[in-house]
Swiss-Prot record:
<dbReference type="GO" id="GO:0000036">
    <property type="term" value="F:acyl carrier activity"/>
</dbReference>
<keyword id="KW-0443">Lipid metabolism</keyword>
<dbReference type="InterPro" id="IPR006162">
    <property type="entry name" value="Ppantetheine_attach_site"/>
</dbReference>
<keyword id="KW-0444">Lipid biosynthesis</keyword>
<dbReference type="GO" id="GO:0005829">
    <property type="term" value="C:cytosol"/>
</dbReference>
<comment type="function">
    <text>Carrier of the growing fatty acid chain in fatty acid biosynthesis.</text>
</comment>
<dbReference type="InterPro" id="IPR036736">
    <property type="entry name" value="ACP-like_sf"/>
</dbReference>
<keyword id="KW-0276">Fatty acid metabolism</keyword>
<comment type="pathway">
    <text>Lipid metabolism; fatty acid biosynthesis.</text>
</comment>
<feature type="modified residue" description="O-(pantetheine 4'-phosphoryl)serine">
    <location>
        <position position="37"/>
    </location>
</feature>
<dbReference type="InterPro" id="IPR003231">
    <property type="entry name" value="ACP"/>
</dbReference>
<dbReference type="GO" id="GO:0009245">
    <property type="term" value="P:lipid A biosynthetic process"/>
</dbReference>
<dbReference type="GO" id="GO:0016020">
    <property type="term" value="C:membrane"/>
</dbReference>
<dbReference type="GO" id="GO:0000035">
    <property type="term" value="F:acyl binding"/>
</dbReference>
<keyword id="KW-0963">Cytoplasm</keyword>
<keyword id="KW-0275">Fatty acid biosynthesis</keyword>
<feature type="domain" description="Carrier">
    <location>
        <begin position="2"/>
        <end position="77"/>
    </location>
</feature>
Amino acid sequence: MSTIEERVKKIIIEQLGVKEDDVKSAASFVDDLGADSLDTVELVMALEEEFDTEIPDEEAEKITTVQAAIDYILSHQE
Protein backbone atom coordinates (compact mmCIF):
# COMPACT_ATOMS: atom_id res chain seq x y z
CA MET A 1 0.00 0.00 0.00
CA SER A 2 1.36 3.38 -0.97
CA THR A 3 1.67 6.11 1.59
CA ILE A 4 -0.62 9.11 1.40
CA GLU A 5 2.34 11.23 0.32
CA GLU A 6 3.13 8.86 -2.56
CA ARG A 7 -0.51 8.72 -3.64
CA VAL A 8 -0.86 12.53 -3.59
CA LYS A 9 2.34 12.95 -5.62
CA LYS A 10 1.20 10.32 -8.14
CA ILE A 11 -2.07 12.21 -8.67
CA ILE A 12 -0.19 15.50 -9.13
CA ILE A 13 2.14 13.89 -11.70
CA GLU A 14 -0.82 12.42 -13.61
CA GLN A 15 -3.04 15.51 -13.45
CA LEU A 16 -0.39 18.10 -14.29
CA GLY A 17 1.77 15.98 -16.60
CA VAL A 18 4.95 16.85 -14.72
CA LYS A 19 8.06 14.82 -13.94
CA GLU A 20 8.32 13.07 -10.59
CA ASP A 21 11.56 14.98 -9.87
CA ASP A 22 9.65 18.29 -10.13
CA VAL A 23 7.08 17.31 -7.51
CA LYS A 24 8.84 18.54 -4.39
CA SER A 25 7.03 19.27 -1.13
CA ALA A 26 7.42 23.04 -1.44
CA ALA A 27 6.49 23.14 -5.15
CA SER A 28 3.64 25.50 -5.98
CA PHE A 29 1.11 24.05 -8.41
CA VAL A 30 0.90 27.32 -10.34
CA ASP A 31 4.37 28.85 -10.00
CA ASP A 32 6.55 25.72 -10.09
CA LEU A 33 4.44 23.10 -11.86
CA GLY A 34 2.70 25.32 -14.42
CA ALA A 35 -0.88 24.59 -13.40
CA ASP A 36 -3.70 26.95 -14.31
CA SER A 37 -6.96 27.41 -12.43
CA LEU A 38 -8.68 24.57 -14.30
CA ASP A 39 -5.75 22.26 -13.53
CA THR A 40 -6.02 23.02 -9.83
CA VAL A 41 -9.78 22.34 -9.83
CA GLU A 42 -9.22 19.02 -11.59
CA LEU A 43 -6.42 18.21 -9.16
CA VAL A 44 -8.68 18.79 -6.16
CA MET A 45 -11.37 16.62 -7.78
CA ALA A 46 -8.84 13.83 -8.32
CA LEU A 47 -7.72 14.07 -4.69
CA GLU A 48 -11.34 13.92 -3.53
CA GLU A 49 -11.93 10.80 -5.61
CA GLU A 50 -8.70 9.04 -4.59
CA PHE A 51 -9.18 9.66 -0.89
CA ASP A 52 -13.00 9.47 -0.84
CA THR A 53 -13.35 12.88 0.75
CA GLU A 54 -14.94 16.22 -0.02
CA ILE A 55 -12.76 19.32 -0.04
CA PRO A 56 -14.81 22.52 0.42
CA ASP A 57 -13.99 25.36 -2.00
CA GLU A 58 -12.60 27.57 0.76
CA GLU A 59 -10.22 24.78 1.76
CA ALA A 60 -9.34 23.93 -1.84
CA GLU A 61 -8.20 27.52 -2.40
CA LYS A 62 -5.60 27.06 0.35
CA ILE A 63 -4.13 23.94 -1.27
CA THR A 64 -1.50 25.61 -3.43
CA THR A 65 1.56 23.42 -2.86
CA VAL A 66 2.36 19.73 -2.86
CA GLN A 67 2.85 19.75 0.92
CA ALA A 68 -0.43 21.61 1.49
CA ALA A 69 -2.25 18.84 -0.40
CA ILE A 70 -0.50 16.13 1.62
CA ASP A 71 -1.19 17.92 4.91
CA TYR A 72 -4.86 18.42 4.07
CA ILE A 73 -5.38 14.76 3.21
CA LEU A 74 -3.46 13.59 6.29
CA SER A 75 -5.52 15.79 8.59
CA HIS A 76 -8.84 14.70 7.06
CA GLN A 77 -8.39 10.94 6.99
CA GLU A 78 -10.72 8.92 9.16
